[in-house]
């Protein structure tokens, strides 16, 4: 009897795992790099706003909120890209394409994730709550941009970085110039690294009529990315000067330069797999800059 109960429990667990696995993949739970690329800039902001380790509840709210909103963003992105994903090699096995998740359930999942995230934000101050409404608008409208403009990567940077002004608002009750400088740096960074991502799908996107910075920049893609990364680093220099950060921050920026240079080495021939590696490598850039900020604000 005990053995039968054990096997029944295992069978039930496997059943639910198989049922929930497509939803986990739809939310990109199996690909944490996207979450980390959102997390690092938000943590930059939290540590700078608090001039050190932020309040534990604020840190928990923003960290959990980042995971929830990133997952929701992936869900709504796949929902709006149903016309495109079946024709792109990298995305043709996504749950909404294969039918393992229905469009209706995807919308329900998006709404649930955003409601939970909003519930967390309601524990913050009024300014943070108001800013979160703008963040919701950005998250919902981003997926449609690739149909109408070659600059969805720029808009992604605007959406991805919205946690920065929210973090300052939550801790300081205002959004100072320092926050907007950091926000601009993140827009430049996101545009640059998401162009690597767009270069992976460039040929398929051209066939389907989708738009991206990779298509817009064409043969000048590496040059423009170099300019974007340079502007990002210069803006981060302004952040360091305005916040009067110590030498550890500047060491982290020098390290970031080396890491970014490595991306151009591995993706210099524009091969899709190499471009994807360059995109993934930006996690180390974000983490390095965070380490510099965290050490520089330690008292």
Curated annotation (Swiss-Prot):
Spans through the membrane: 33-53, 56-76, 105-125, 151-171, 180-200, 214-234, 247-267, 278-298
Pathways involved: Cofactor biosynthesis; ubiquinone biosynthesis
A GO cellular-component term linked to this record: plasma membrane
Function: Catalyzes the prenylation of para-hydroxybenzoate (PHB) with an all-trans polyprenyl group. Mediates the second step in the final reaction sequence of ubiquinone-8 (UQ-8) biosynthesis, which is the condensation of the polyisoprenoid side chain with PHB, generating the first membrane-bound Q intermediate 3-octaprenyl-4-hydroxybenzoate.
Enzyme Commission number(s): 2.5.1.39
Family affiliation: Belongs to the UbiA prenyltransferase family.
Family annotation (NCBIfam families): ubiA_proteo (TIGR01474)
Gene: ubiA
UniProt-recorded name of the protein: 4-hydroxybenzoate octaprenyltransferase
Subcellular location as annotated: Cell inner membrane
Example of a GO biological process term: ubiquinone biosynthetic process
InterPro entries tied to this protein: HB_polyprenyltransferase-like, Prenyltransferase, UbiA_prenyltransferase, UbiA_prenylTrfase_CS, UbiA_sf
Essential cofactor(s): Mg(2+)
Highest taxon above the source species: Bacteria
Annotated keywords: Cell inner membrane, Cell membrane, Magnesium, Membrane, Transferase, Transmembrane, Transmembrane helix, Ubiquinone biosynthesis
GO molecular function, one term: 4-hydroxybenzoate polyprenyltransferase activity
Catalytic activity: all-trans-octaprenyl diphosphate + 4-hydroxybenzoate = 4-hydroxy-3-(all-trans-octaprenyl)benzoate + diphosphate
Topology term for the membrane: Multi-pass membrane protein
Pfam families recorded: UbiA
């Amino acid at each position: 009897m005990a053995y039968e109960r054990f096997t029944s429990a295992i069978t039930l667990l496997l059943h639910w795992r198989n049922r929930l696995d497509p939803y986990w993949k739809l939310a990109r739970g199996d690909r944490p790099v996207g979450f980390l690329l959102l997390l690092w800039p938000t943590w930059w902001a939290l540590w700078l706003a608090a001039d050190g380790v932020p309040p534990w509840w604020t840190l928990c709210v923003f960290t959990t909120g980042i995971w929830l909103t990133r997952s929701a963003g992936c869900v709504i992105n796949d929902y709006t890209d149903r016309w495109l994903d079946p024709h792109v090699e990298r995305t043709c096995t996504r749950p909404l394409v294969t039918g393992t998740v229905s469009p209706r359930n995807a919308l329900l999942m998006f709404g649930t994730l955003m409601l939970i995230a909003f519930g967390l934000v309601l524990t913050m101050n009024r300014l943070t709550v108001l800013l979160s409404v703008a963040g919701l608008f950005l998250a919902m409208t981003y997926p449609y941009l690739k149909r109408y403009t070659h600059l969805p990567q720029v808009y992604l940077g605007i959406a991805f970085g919205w946690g920065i002004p929210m973090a300052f608002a939550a801790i300081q009750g205002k959004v100072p110039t320092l926050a907007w400088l950091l926000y601009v740096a993140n827009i430049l960074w996101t545009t640059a690294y998401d162009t690597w991502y767009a270069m992976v799908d460039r040929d398929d996107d051209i066939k389907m009529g989708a738009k991206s910075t990779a298509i817009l920049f064409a043969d000048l893609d590496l040059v423009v990315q170099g300019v974007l990364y340079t502007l990002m680093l210069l803006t981060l220099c302004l952040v360091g000067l305005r916040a009067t950060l110590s030498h550890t921050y500047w060491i982290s920026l020098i390290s970031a330069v080396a890491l970014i240079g490595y991306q151009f080495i591995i993706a210099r021939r524009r091969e899709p797999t190499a471009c994807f590696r360059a995109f993934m490598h930006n996690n180390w850039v974000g983490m390095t800059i965070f380490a510099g900020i965290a050490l520089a604000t330690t008292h």
